[in-house]
Amino acid sequence: MARLFTLSESKYYLMALDAGTGSIRAVIFDLEGNQIAVGQAEWRHLAVPDVPGSMEFDLNKNWQLACECMRQALHNAGIAPEYIAAVSACSMREGIVLYNNEGAPIWACANVDARAAREVSELKELHNNTFENEVYRATGQTLALSAIPRLLWLAHHRSDIYRQASTITMISDWLAYMLSGELAVDPSNAGTTGLLDLTTRDWKPALLDMAGLRADILSPVKETGTLLGVVSSQAAELCGLKAGTPVVVGGGDVQLGCLGLGVVRPAQTAVLGGTFWQQVVNLAAPVTDPEMNVRVNPHVIPGMVQAESISFFTGLTMRWFRDAFCAEEKLIAERLGIDTYTLLEEMASRVPPGSWGVMPIFSDRMRFKTWYHAAPSFINLSIDPDKCNKATLFRALEENAAIVSACNLQQIADFSNIHPSSLVFAGGGSKGKLWSQILADVSGLPVNIPVVKEATALGCAIAAGVGAGIFSSMAETGERLVRWERTHTPDPEKHELYQDSRDKWQAVYQDQLGLVDHGLTTSLWKAPGL
């Protein structure tokens, strides 16, 4: 594509819309990847009365919030709308939006919507209990989080919406549509519907046919970084952008986050430490796990896929521990003018590796086909206050998060034969220097920490720049813009110690799952349909 702007024209900027599970952000970057301003608002999903597990996405309210964020970002940046060279959107995966034949959005659900548990069970029984295997081999997804059971639920319970539905997109595509009036999906996000073929990077309508569902609702597929359209005059009045601003196809939050981290080549590996922790490994060609433990998603880089494992509620568990047990440390940290986690890490640094044998039981390694976890607990506590205290438990939680990540990376290596030589660690967890070092010691790999730790919006801005002709290549731009803060080198002796801790933890966790299986304890989380 011919350049619409030149890099020397430093007055131009890029806008990224980042639609997460709990909030929407509009982030403005300059052409060197520096964040200039942000507008942010929390949003809440709607539980439908008498529909257990439902979490609908409030289309009207959330579009208003998105527009407010765009206006706020422009105001905070102090720049005129005409200097936004392009805009793109990324979002949580799995959340879907349906439109009628006039193009009006009529229904949407967030990624956390779990209403279709019965439909998941029904679908698993299709084709002599082989349907889920067929979905996974083609798309890299199982049924629990896919769009297929949600569409079947609508067919069963909201036939009015199901009959009206003419098109399906993801939430990032909905934002782009509201700006431009153009409907399309990208492979990285649409891949999480369980309806997109990993090899062709296009829909596989036969899967809907096999499920007895309509296959006439599939949107055009366009690659991330493709020019979709321009901001309409109607949208411009609402959001503050200039009519005619290029709108570029975005993508899934994790894949665009990897772009923003420069994780764009085969075998490159990242651990993204947020509320959930994702362990992602770039694969040069589509391959799936014979054991169905790991999901496989299209990367935003054409032709490449990502094996992805997920640790559940890792960041949330740390926040729970801080808020439930560390009121004193929160007060001390406030007086010192530091973050509470920084103080807790300083305390935990005085605890020996292995945390005196304490084993946290929270997230299991990922088992995508039969995905559930044990009841939260700490195992192997002692009543010696010098050895078993807040500092010990905090370090044990950090060590356990690293152990689960290492288990997940090993699962990926088992089927892909990819053994990374280093890790990129990003997200909120990577702010912790002790946690970063523990991850290096547990994994046995050098861990690189980027300057920009929340890289999803940056990756989205890079896509916008490619679509506008500012950048020639997403991969090259991601590599050029990423900057590194520090590297943590593994300690071989600690790595050996953690190998033993990992083996013991896996054995204990299996026993804890047995308590859930016998109905004696309650799972931390269980996938719909189990």
Swiss-Prot record:
Catalytic reactions of this protein: (S)-4,5-dihydroxypentane-2,3-dione + ATP = (2S)-2-hydroxy-3,4-dioxopentyl phosphate + ADP + H(+)
Record CDD domains: ASKHA_NBD_FGGY_AI-2K (cd07775)
Localization annotation: Cytoplasm
Enzyme class: transferase
Listed GO CC annotations: cytoplasm
Bilayer-spanning residue ranges: none
Gene3D superfamilies, alphabetized: 3.30.420.40
UniProt keyword terms in alphabetical order: Cytoplasm, Kinase, Transferase
Gene Ontology MF terms in the entry: autoinducer-2 kinase activity
Any GO BP: carbohydrate metabolic process
InterPro entries: AI-2_kinase (IPR033676), ATPase_NBD (IPR043129), Carb_kinase_FGGY (IPR000577), FGGY_C (IPR018485), FGGY_Carb_Kinase (IPR050406), FGGY_N (IPR018484)
Classification via Pfam families: FGGY_C, FGGY_N
EC number assigned by the record: 2.7.1.189
Family under the similarity heading: Belongs to the FGGY kinase family.
PANTHER family attached to this UniProt entry: AUTOINDUCER-2 KINASE (PTHR43095:SF1), SUGAR KINASE (PTHR43095)
Function: Catalyzes the phosphorylation of autoinducer-2 (AI-2) to phospho-AI-2, which subsequently inactivates the transcriptional regulator LsrR and leads to the transcription of the lsr operon. Phosphorylates the ring-open form of (S)-4,5-dihydroxypentane-2,3-dione (DPD), which is the precursor to all AI-2 signaling molecules, at the C5 position. Required for the regulation of the lsr operon and many other genes.
NCBIfam families attached to this UniProt entry: PRK10939.1
Protein known as: Autoinducer-2 kinase
Originating organism: Escherichia coli (strain K12)
